[in-house]
């Protein structure tokens, strides 16, 4: 048997982390078993489905590297197939037309609630022969009257539901459009899906869908339902907790494999291992180690993983991802150091690519923004003479290299009997605008001689102006 899994999002909003984890688990299960992963867009909600959301799903999957073997298939392109199966079920007596009005159904619901009964359709049209006479109708499934629906969920174990608890669900609405539970069964059947991995909000749909599979003499897939992801406050993850859309994490500067590594550990474990390459995920993944408990999304843990990959990945690969952030900020990368050289000195100083971009822009701009507190603290008249001497020493350098730069700084600090920090920190503020940067020799080396000298000259003017104002 060839394992075939699917990811079937509805394009009614962004691709959120819960959906991404479902996609990841489905993708990993298929890859682990040398199977196939199918993408299906469940776009039957015509009012809420948008092409923009479809594109966000495709872009998010591409960014994460969750490539699909087939698809994307669109439910709206399969309406003829749903009608064909509905007519087949009608012909076989496994479905029936229902002409109950909205008013009757609402009155039925209110009466059942008043009697403290579970609201459900009472089968009013079940045994009537209603011709297609032009009166609006829905098509309902003739659910078995008796017996028990039993299935083994790969996460939750054995589940049993009495058919008496299930009413006759609607398959096709009066406007001819299929319902979710009907379309998804036909799709999984036609697409030969062997394993349905999805959120546990669908677990109540499963007995109904199993009955439909059996009515169609279709093979019933294996089901695995994943517990939901909560925020750290124990509430369902939402926008108030921060980023929840996969492409928002790209904007925040999270590397795609860092997000995958984090998500795979939300509800799944492989011993005590925390760090997984994508290949290690594929090799190790199984469903038996998926937890039944809910997971909490912890941003600190995600950024810890992200920083790990920033430091352990090759500077070239991190630079490729970082480039997008500089482009979004409108920074001309031709005006500064090679990005891979920047990554080599900044990766361990930042938790994200967005932060790396933000604190590194002074390497690529002609002008810098000064932190006024840093200026007041370090660009004081007392350092004017040492910085003037350092300026001349640096300007005279033939080789603009780390060791030569550091040698100049050391010599000037000795000449004026200053602690190294007393000269390095004013120099740092002079060339970066702030009191934090990589090592001062590396900072100047990456900036280049011309920028470093020009900024030091600008800082000397600031100090002279400050001295004359005293």
Curated annotation (Swiss-Prot):
Keyword RNA-binding applies: no
Coiled-coil portions: none
UniProt motif ('KMSKS' region) ranges: 236-240
Residues engaged in binding ATP: 239
GO CC entries: cytosol
EC number, as in UniProt: 6.1.1.17
Top-level taxon: Bacteria
One function term, GO molecular function aspect: zinc ion binding
Biological process terms in GO annotation: glutamyl-tRNA aminoacylation
Motif ('HIGH' region) on chain: 9-19
Keyword check for Transcription regulation: no
Subcellular location: Cytoplasm
Catalytic function, reaction form: tRNA(Glu) + L-glutamate + ATP = L-glutamyl-tRNA(Glu) + AMP + diphosphate
Enzymatic class: ligase
Keywords: Aminoacyl-tRNA synthetase, ATP-binding, Cytoplasm, Ligase, Nucleotide-binding, Protein biosynthesis
Family to which the UniProt record says this protein belongs: Belongs to the class-I aminoacyl-tRNA synthetase family. Glutamate--tRNA ligase type 1 subfamily.
NCBIfam families noted in UniProt: gltX_bact
SUBUNIT field: Monomer.
HAMAP family cross-referenced by the UniProt entry: Glu_tRNA_synth_type1
Role noted for this protein: Catalyzes the attachment of glutamate to tRNA(Glu) in a two-step reaction: glutamate is first activated by ATP to form Glu-AMP and then transferred to the acceptor end of tRNA(Glu).
Protein's name according to its UniProt entry: Glutamate--tRNA ligase
């Amino acid at each position: 048997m060839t394992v075939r899994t699917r990811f079937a999002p509805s394009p009614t909003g962004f691709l959120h982390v819960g959906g991404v984890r479902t996609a990841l688990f489905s993708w990993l299960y298929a890859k682990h078993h040398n199977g196939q992963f199918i993408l299906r867009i469940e776009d039957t909600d015509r009012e809420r489905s948008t092409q923009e959301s479809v594109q966000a799903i495709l872009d998010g999957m591409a960014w994460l590297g969750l490539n699909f073997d087939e698809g994307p298939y669109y439910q709206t392109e399969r309406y003829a197939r749903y009608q064909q199966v509905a007519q087949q079920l009608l012909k076989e007596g496994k479905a029936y037309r229902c002409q109950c009005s909205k008013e009757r159904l609402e009155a039925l619901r209110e009466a059942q609630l008043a009697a403290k009964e579970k609201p459900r359709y009472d089968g009013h049209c079940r045994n009537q022969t209603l011709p297609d006479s032009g009166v609006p109708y829905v098509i309902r499934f003739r659910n078995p009257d008796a017996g028990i629906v039993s299935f083994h969920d790969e996460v939750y174990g054995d589940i049993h539901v009495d058919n008496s608890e299930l009413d006759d669900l609607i398959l096709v609405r009066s406007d001819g459009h299929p319902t979710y539970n009907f379309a998804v069964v036909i799709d999984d059947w036609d697409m030969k899906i062997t394993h349905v991995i999805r959120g546990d909000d669908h677990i109540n749909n499963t007995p109904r869908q199993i009955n439909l599979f059996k009515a169609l003499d279709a093979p019933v897939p294996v089901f695995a339902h994943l517990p939901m992801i909560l925020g750290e406050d124990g509430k369902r993850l939402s926008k108030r907790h921060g980023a929840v859309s996969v492409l928002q994490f790209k904007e925040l500067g999270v590397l795609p494999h860092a997000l995958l590594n984090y998500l795979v550990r939300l509800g799944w474990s492989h011993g005590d291992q925390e760090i997984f390459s994508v290949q290690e995920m594929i090799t190790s993944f199984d469903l038996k180690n998926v937890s039944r408990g809910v997971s909490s999304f912890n941003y600190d843990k995600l950024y810890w993983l992200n920083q790990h990959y920033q430091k352990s990945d090759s500077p070239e690969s991190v630079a490729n991802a970082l480039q997008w952030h500089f482009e979004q900020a409108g920074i001309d990368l031709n005006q500064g150091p090679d990005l891979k050289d920047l990554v080599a000195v900044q990766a361990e100083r930042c938790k994200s690519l967005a932060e790396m971009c933000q604190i590194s822009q002074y390497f690529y701009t002609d002008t810098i923004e000064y932190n006024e507190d840093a200026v007041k603290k370090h660009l004081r008249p007392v350092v004017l003479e040492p910085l003037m001497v350092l300026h001349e020493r640096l300007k005279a350098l033939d080789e603009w290299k780390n060791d030569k730069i550091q040698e100049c700084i050391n010599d000037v600090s000795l000449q004026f009997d200053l602690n190294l920090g007393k000269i390095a920190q004013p120099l740092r503020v002079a060339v970066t605008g702030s009191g934090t940067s990589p090592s001062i020799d590396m900072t100047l080396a990456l900036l280049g001689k011309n920028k470093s000298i020009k900024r030091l000259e600008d800082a000397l003017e600031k100090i002279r102006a400050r001295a004359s104002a005293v």
